[in-house]
């Protein structure tokens, strides 16, 4: 007598991976996420490999996780995968204190972000 199985939230031809609490602002992470949105996964991996952004390594790791989920958990063909969605959400913001001159202080905000990548299998139609 257990809980009933929850229905699958994604269609049968999709898989996703989520990277939480990435230590980067959502705006900066969205620049890298926009770089791979809508591309084939091999092209997206190559773009992330040669990107000069610091967070590109974490985005690449999340994309590789989504590809592995598609292959191992959902039996999708890796050669037909496309990044259908790559979206960013805000996580918490650490607030720190920085002592300034004349007894003053300044707040330092250290934002975190969440990244969700959804890959979809797009079959090439035989023409």
UniProtKB/Swiss-Prot annotation:
Checking InterPro entries in the record gives: Ribosomal_uL22 (IPR001063), Ribosomal_uL22_bac/chlpt-type (IPR005727), Ribosomal_uL22_bac/org-type (IPR047867), Ribosomal_uL22_CS (IPR018260), Ribosomal_uL22_sf (IPR036394)
CDD domains, alphabetically? Ribosomal_L22
Write one Gene Ontology MF term: rRNA binding
Does this entry carry the keyword rRNA-binding?
Answer: yes
Keyword annotations for this protein, in alphabetical order, are: Ribonucleoprotein, Ribosomal protein, RNA-binding, rRNA-binding
Q: Which SUPFAM superfamilies match?
A: Ribosomal protein L22
Which Gene Ontology terms of cellular component type are present?
Answer: cytosolic large ribosomal subunit
Keyword Ribonucleoprotein carried by entry: yes
GO terms classed as biological process: translation
HAMAP family recorded: Ribosomal_uL22_B (MF_01331_B)
Q: Which family does it belong to?
A: Belongs to the universal ribosomal protein uL22 family.
Subunit field text:
Part of the 50S ribosomal subunit.
Primary role: This protein binds specifically to 23S rRNA; its binding is stimulated by other ribosomal proteins, e.g. L4, L17, and L20. It is important during the early stages of 50S assembly. It makes multiple contacts with different domains of the 23S rRNA in the assembled 50S subunit and ribosome. The globular domain of the protein is located near the polypeptide exit tunnel on the outside of the subunit, while an extended beta-hairpin is found that lines the wall of the exit tunnel in the center of the 70S ribosome.
User: Can you name this protein?
Assistant: Large ribosomal subunit protein uL22
What organism is recorded for this protein? Methylorubrum extorquens (strain PA1)
